[in-house]
Amino acid sequence: MTDQTTRLPVRRALISVSDKTGILEFARELQQLGVEILSTGGTYKLLKDNGVNAVEVADYTGFAEMMDGRVKTLHPKIHGGILGRRGTDDAIMNEHGIKPIDLVAVNLYPFEATISKPGCDLPTAIENIDIGGPTMVRSAAKNHKDVAIVVNASDYAGIVEGLKVGGLTYAQRFDLMLKAFEHTAAYDGMIANYMGTIDQAKDTLSTADRSEFPRTFNSQFVKAQEMRYGENPHQSAAFYVEAKKGEASISTAIQLQGKELSFNNVADTDAALECVKSFVKPACVIVKHANPCGVAVVPEEEGGIRKAYDLAYATDTESAFGGIIAFNRELDGETAKAIVDRQFVEVIIAPKISQAARDVVAAKQNVRLLECGEWPAERAAGWDFKRVNGGLLVQSRDIGMITADDLKIVTKRAPTEQEIHDLVFAWKVAKFVKSNAIVYAKQRQTIGVGAGQMSRVNSARIAAIKAEHAGLQVQGAVMASDAFFPFRDGIDNAAKVGISAVIQPGGSMRDAEVIAAADEAGIAMVFTGMRHFRH
């Protein structure tokens, strides 16, 4: 068993980096500690020009760089120095004049940045595939018992601190080794993903008209948390986040207080946050079992998120119990007090949490309070995944959304201005309700949500029941459906409960029949031409 606390000093280091962030300071610290530095190409020039003593690898090996820099470090004096086992390979190393290299600081050619540039062609992409770098990284990682490998600039300071007290422990070197293999795995995966999108059936291979989906799919996620259990207590679970952070989300949120997030907390909070992101004006979304059970939008001058919370809660006070609450504005103390005084809540999430709100919620120690940061108005494109037994379904994110200008009026009566506001609001909510989804709304407040039914008509019936149970008036409300109505019965039922306007994708074989039903009832109906199934 290796002693994890024994420190090994560093006498010789090899530095060769593409990303030169912090490398000068790191090299200067190594030099002050008496470490001999070997370096290559641009890194060597940077160090030399800034007064850091370094030996160029070509001078050290006696073998000049060649093939436009393709061959620099691929030499026995380099890899023997990295891979040589101290106490086992000393004799053969001495015989061939190979000196041990105790630390390797390497990061790789910027392949991702290169292929992200407009007009990047295949030869350019290929030239930015690093060979010597990954080889050194893997060699040093394999021999981490004797060698420290550093691929992240964020580790430089910790390494220097360790060297100042006698060297790096095995535990430190093991952690650096793991980071190194994660680094090369992500790098190789990125290359395979990119090359796997090129159409091999064409006579000339080109990066033009690449497929959206690679032949094999590689992605890297980092474990953020091990959970007590999964969706159910008999299931084990962990939460992994994308290695490269994107827009504000549940994966980037900071937990300010409360119990550890559960598997279901994460899933439900994601649903709530993604829904509330859809709104520009102050909004509140309450979610239970990944379905919105109450949503409202209220302009600042009419009460903002404080009023929006009241209206969202009023939609379904029973389902809101133990729910997740999301806002698209800073959570203030008054709104926080209204929540904790009124109901049991699992999670509250907002882009920012005021100190007053933190002080209020602190009295409820179990409430999970999350701050996720601001998000851009434009939603980032990306992929969504759904696991099936033995496979993975991959699709582009459903970031499609409509405005009033996109609506196609298909009935004799056009919707009023207020109805249009409510229709667009209800449509945004319906996108986040499990199919079949029906949403009743009035004055930009949900008054009934029917979710997850096999029959669209039954979802509509549930929405009406929810509204009646909450004491909310359906008469004059609008209705949103995430997919088209296959028969007129959905409209007939809407007319019976007092729905005044309907928004739906359209596209049914019986659209004419459905439109006729709306006209008979004096209902205004608009088509979006866009479906929002959610399973």
UniProtKB/Swiss-Prot annotation:
Its EC number is 2.1.2.3, 3.5.4.10. The keyword Transferase applies. One of its GO terms (cellular component) is cytosol. PROSITE patterns: MGS (PS51855). GO terms for molecular function: IMP cyclohydrolase activity; phosphoribosylaminoimidazolecarboxamide formyltransferase activity. SUPFAM superfamilies: Cytidine deaminase-like, Methylglyoxal synthase-like. Pathway: Purine metabolism; IMP biosynthesis via de novo pathway; 5-formamido-1-(5-phospho-D-ribosyl)imidazole-4-carboxamide from 5-amino-1-(5-phospho-D-ribosyl)imidazole-4-carboxamide (10-formyl THF route): step 1/1; Purine metabolism; IMP biosynthesis via de novo pathway; IMP from 5-formamido-1-(5-phospho-D-ribosyl)imidazole-4-carboxamide: step 1/1. Transmembrane segments: none annotated. Keywords: Hydrolase, Multifunctional enzyme, Purine biosynthesis, Transferase. Coiled coil: none annotated. The keyword Cell wall biogenesis/degradation does not apply. InterPro entries: AICAR_Tfase_dup_dom_sf (IPR024051), Cytidine_deaminase-like (IPR016193), MGS-like_dom (IPR011607), MGS-like_dom_sf (IPR036914), PurH-like (IPR002695). It catalyses: (6R)-10-formyltetrahydrofolate + 5-amino-1-(5-phospho-beta-D-ribosyl)imidazole-4-carboxamide = 5-formamido-1-(5-phospho-D-ribosyl)imidazole-4-carboxamide + (6S)-5,6,7,8-tetrahydrofolate; IMP + H2O = 5-formamido-1-(5-phospho-D-ribosyl)imidazole-4-carboxamide. GO terms for biological process: 'de novo' IMP biosynthetic process. Residues 6-151 form the MGS-like domain. Belongs to the PurH family. The IMP cyclohydrolase activity resides in the N-terminal region. This is Bifunctional purine biosynthesis protein PurH. It comes from Pseudomonas putida (strain GB-1).
